[in-house]
C-alpha cells in the first residue's frame, strides 16, 4: 500500500461525508440534543385564548346605555321595563343552570307556554258538545255581572235572534219577537216598561219615515210630507166654439111655408 492509495482513501471518506451532509437537507443545526424535543412540545401546546375583556366591556357599555334610556321614561313604563328585564334575567339564569338547552324547545318559558297550550287542547276535547237539551244559561255570556258584560250579552243575543227572521218572517214576528218582548218585560218596573214602549214608538216612526221615503222614490212628483203631489189638469182641445150649445140649431124651428113650388125646381 502506497501513500498515493492512502490519499485516495481520504478523498473517498470526504465524499461520503459531504453526501451525508447533503442528505440532511436544509434542517437547522441544533446546539444540543435536547432542543428538538423542546421544540415539539412548544408546537403541541394549545394557543392561548383571547381574553373576553373586550366583549364584557362592550356589554357593559350597552347595558349602561339601556339604563340611561330607561331613566328618561315615565315611572310606570320604567317599572314595567324593569320588571320585564328581571323576569328575562331569571329565565336566562335558570337556562344557564340547566345547561345548554335548545331555546325553542327546552327554555323554561317555552316549556310553560307549551304546557298551557296542551292543557287548553285537552280542555277543548273534554268539553261536551252543545245540544238542544244543553241549558243556554250555562254559556259564559250569561255569567254577566258588569254593564259591559250585559251589553255584550245583548249584542250576542240580538245578532243570533235577528237572523231567524230570514228563515220565517211570520214565525219570527208572531211566535218569537212579540212574545219575547212581553216575557222579558214582565220583571221590569212600570217606568221601565214605559221607556220600552217609548223606544218602540220611536222605532215605529223611523219605520214609517223609511217606508214613506221609499214610496216617494217610486212615485213621480211626490212631496216631502208623503203626498203624491198635485196632478196636472189635462188640456182640452179648443175647436173654436163650433160645438157650443148656444150655437146649436133645432130642426123643428125651421119655417117651411116660405118655400114655393119654384124652390124645388
From Swiss-Prot:
**Cellular component aspect of the GO annotation:** eukaryotic 43S preinitiation complex; eukaryotic 48S preinitiation complex; eukaryotic translation initiation factor 3 complex
Any one GO MF term held by the record is:
translation initiation factor activity
Compositionally skewed regions (Basic residues) per UniProt? 46-57
User: What name appears for this protein in its UniProt entry?
Assistant: Eukaryotic translation initiation factor 3 subunit J
GO terms, biological process: formation of cytoplasmic translation initiation complex
Q: Does the keyword Cytoplasm apply?
A: yes
Disulfide links within the chain? none
The record's Pfam families line, in alphabetical order, gives: eIF3_subunit
Coiled coil feature spans: 78-106, 190-220
- List keywords of the entry alphabetically: Coiled coil, Cytoplasm, Initiation factor, Protein biosynthesis
Q: Where along the chain is composition biased (Acidic residues)?
A: 24-34
Read off the InterPro entries from this record.
eIF3-like_dom_sf (IPR023194), eIF3j (IPR013906)
What Gene3D superfamilies does UniProt report for this protein, alphabetically? Eukaryotic translation initiation factor 3 like domains (1.10.246.60)
Give a short account of what the protein does.
Component of the eukaryotic translation initiation factor 3 (eIF-3) complex, which is involved in protein synthesis of a specialized repertoire of mRNAs and, together with other initiation factors, stimulates binding of mRNA and methionyl-tRNAi to the 40S ribosome. The eIF-3 complex specifically targets and initiates translation of a subset of mRNAs involved in cell proliferation.
Spell out the Basic and acidic residues composition-biased ranges: 35-45
Disordered as annotated region, ranges:
24-74
**Principal location:** cytoplasm
Q: According to its UniProt record, which protein family does this protein belong to?
A: Belongs to the eIF-3 subunit J family.
Keyword Nucleotide-binding included in the entry's annotation = no
Where in the cell does this protein reside? Answer: Cytoplasm
Q: How does it assemble?
A: Component of the eukaryotic translation initiation factor 3 (eIF-3) complex.
